[in-house]
């Protein structure tokens, strides 16, 4: 998920860690602008009844907008107190893309800038309100882990090919389950599979 994180890959081994806990409240965080992610989020909403909190990406790109960060954090707090989880994303995920190529320097700069805002939102939420994370996008994963004072991810297995899962290996939330994926990866049900996996539904 990025050079700033230490990834300990134990997939295929028998790591000396506690049994993976079943998450009860899951926070899905995506900084992706990919149409694949938009379809996956809509599917997750429809099947699981989750609600999403959307950040105003245009505003956050041009001004600090601390009230926008506070608004999102407050709404997420309300949802996590009442429901099984919530989704944090940018409004721009659901309308036409900017047209930047994946390797465009401007696109990468925008992506990192917006991902940092996601970390700011999580930094204002009581971390006891959730016990599982699904992170979409490499910049998102780095920003979220930084905000949670986590420097290591312990990868244990894959939900499906290309969707690694594991635990936060250090920091205040050490031991909580996490699933990561790239924004463009997967089919419509990929996030739904991740949701069921992290909650251990059907096991």
Language-model region placement:
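A glycine- and small-aliphatic-rich helix-loop capping segment at beta-alpha/alpha-beta transitions
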Residues: 8-10, 148-158, 196-200
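Short, small-residue-biased leader/transition segments that mark boundaries at the very start
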Residues: 1-7
């Amino acid at each position: 998920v990025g050079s700033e994180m230490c990834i300990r890959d134990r997939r295929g081994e028998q790591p000396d860690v506690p049994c993976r806990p079943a998450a009860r409240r899951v926070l899905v965080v995506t900084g992706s602008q990919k149409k694949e992610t938009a379809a996956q989020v809509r599917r997750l909403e429809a099947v699981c009844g989750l609600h999403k909190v959307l950040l105003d990406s245009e505003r956050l790109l041009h001004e600090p907008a601390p009230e926008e960060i506070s608004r999102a954090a407050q709404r997420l707090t309300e949802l996590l107190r009442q429901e099984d989880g919530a989704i944090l994303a940018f409004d721009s995920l659901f309308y036409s893309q900017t047209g930047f190529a994946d390797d465009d320097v401007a696109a990468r700069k925008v992506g990192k800038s917006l991902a940092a805002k996601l970390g700011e939102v999580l930094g204002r939420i009581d971390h006891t309100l959730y016990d599982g994370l699904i992170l979409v996008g490499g910049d998102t994963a780095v920003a979220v882990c930084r905000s949670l004072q986590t420097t290591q991810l312990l990868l244990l297995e894959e939900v499906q090919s290309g969707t690694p899962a594991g635990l936060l290996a250090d920091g205040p939330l050490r031991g909580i389950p996490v699933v990561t994926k790239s924004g463009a990866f997967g089919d419509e049900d990929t996030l739904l599979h991740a949701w069921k996996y992290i909650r251990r539904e059907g096991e």
